[in-house]
Amino acid sequence: MKKGRVSQVLGPVVDVRFEDGHLPEIYNAIKVTHKAQNENEVDIDLTLEVALHLGDDSVRTIAMASTDGVTRGMEAIDLGEPISVPVGNVTLGRVFNVLGENIDLDEPLPADAAKDPIHREAPKFDQLSTEVEILETGIKVVDLLAPYIKGGKIGLFGGAGVGKTVLIQELINNIAQEHGGISVFAGVGERTREGNDLYYEMKDSGVIGKTAMVFGQMNEPPGARMRVALTGLTMAEHFRDKEGQDVLFFIDNIFRFTQAGSEVSALLGRMPSAVGYQPTLATEMGQLQERITSTNVGSVTSIQAIYVPADDYTDPAPATTFAHLDATTNLERKLSEMGIYPAVDPLASTSRALSPEIVGEEHYEVARSVQQILQRYKELQDIIAMLGMDELSDEDKLVVSRARRVQFFLSQNFHVAEQFTGQKGSYVPVKETVKGFKEILEGKYDHLPEDAFRLVGRIEEVVEKAKEMGVEV
């Protein structure tokens, strides 16, 4: 291992000079350690990542933690490889930082735990799976109208308090229970409190044992926030490539990844591009997203929360992300206010998998009919608000009646919310979902009260609920 000395410290940017003509490769990890000599000093154990070659045997690096206490002349050791993080079953149920160090107050990982570097090539063309396979989630509104693809990328849009976290938890639970799948959660630029809450909620709901969690919180330097998504992805890739698993990979929030990249770019002195973003925005996004894919062995399916600055979808950060997405799930506050959970907007959510060749003719026809009837209901709402239901034609009254049943039937109880609602969660297979909506659209349940359709799973549960309400079925 070659040694050098710190020559300059500029916040999260540290320059290191090496001797004997040695120059570490780009992305190599460099370690700076220093034992405090007196009470005015602090112990330093800092990892840097090489970002630029400056010439004269010097490199410019980005710090993965605070550089407080680092001074010129401190010894820096080139580790000769990129940052490496633990992978495999030892990561399940644990919480890590960007360097793969556990931060959950449990026992440290065994010293001989397998490790992989966070920088690697995307899978080669001949390793990619060309089959388009639907990932059944058991959540009706998702499976029917915006189905997820195994190895695909899904954008999850939603404000505060509309149910993003609960939807993420339910997806983790359903994949674990029904498919025996593993999940990796990467909190990128997250609020520490939210990450903490998520950890304890997952512990309480029992899904933590199938999940690895990685956090680079909001208060950490941009280097940590930019690399933490790669740390999580490396853990997910191991389960895909070495164990043939179908892995679910959550990133919250992908915008913070871009934001951290922008900060690093400015610190390295690069000329900013449009709206102040880094000129390498598309490259950085591509390097991350291209590694998230299906191979002949397994798949990594990613669900990414996306913050849209000032609701401007043409902003370079969300616009660059959209190019990579296969499906979008939009959460709508109005639906959560109506008590419809999950509050997924059935008209704004999209998926490239919703075509007859992929989901089948029947599923496609039912999904399109559901969207048409909900769209017509939306158009009629202004008339209803002004003139009331009585002014509608008989045909439109029937549309409204069925649309409301459809809207309520798109809701369902979640397993992870059982302790709050007191009602059992439901996992609904796609076939049952399609059958239920088809029968509602055909008018088979026009005689049942609307409330019987609210927060249930299969269509049979609607009939049972109606019986409990004293309605003759």
From Swiss-Prot:
Membrane topology field: Peripheral membrane protein
Record-listed ATP binding positions: 158-165
GO-annotated cellular components: plasma membrane; proton-transporting ATP synthase complex
EC number: 7.1.2.2
SMART domains tied to this protein: AAA
Name of one Pfam family that matches: ATP-synt_VA_C
Catalytic activity: ATP + H2O + 4 H(+)(in) = ADP + phosphate + 5 H(+)(out)
InterPro entries in UniProt: AAA+_ATPase, ATP-synt_VA_C, ATP_synth_F1_bsu, ATPase_a/bsu_AS, ATPase_alpha/beta_chains, ATPase_F1/V1/A1_a/bsu_N, ATPase_F1/V1/A1_a/bsu_N_sf, ATPase_F1/V1/A1_a/bsu_nucl-bd
GO terms for MF: ATP binding; ATP hydrolysis activity; proton-transporting ATP synthase activity, rotational mechanism
UniProt keyword list: ATP synthesis, ATP-binding, Cell membrane, CF(1), Hydrogen ion transport, Ion transport, Membrane, Nucleotide-binding, Translocase, Transport
Compartments reported by the entry: Cell membrane
Annotated family: Belongs to the ATPase alpha/beta chains family.
NCBIfam families: atpD
Assembly, per entry: F-type ATPases have 2 components, CF(1) - the catalytic core - and CF(0) - the membrane proton channel. CF(1) has five subunits: alpha(3), beta(3), gamma(1), delta(1), epsilon(1). CF(0) has three main subunits: a(1), b(2) and c(9-12). The alpha and beta chains form an alternating ring which encloses part of the gamma chain. CF(1) is attached to CF(0) by a central stalk formed by the gamma and epsilon chains, while a peripheral stalk is formed by the delta and b chains.
Function noted in UniProt: Produces ATP from ADP in the presence of a proton gradient across the membrane. The catalytic sites are hosted primarily by the beta subunits.
Protein name (database record): ATP synthase subunit beta
Organism of provenance: Bacillus licheniformis (strain ATCC 14580 / DSM 13 / JCM 2505 / CCUG 7422 / NBRC 12200 / NCIMB 9375 / NCTC 10341 / NRRL NRS-1264 / Gibson 46)
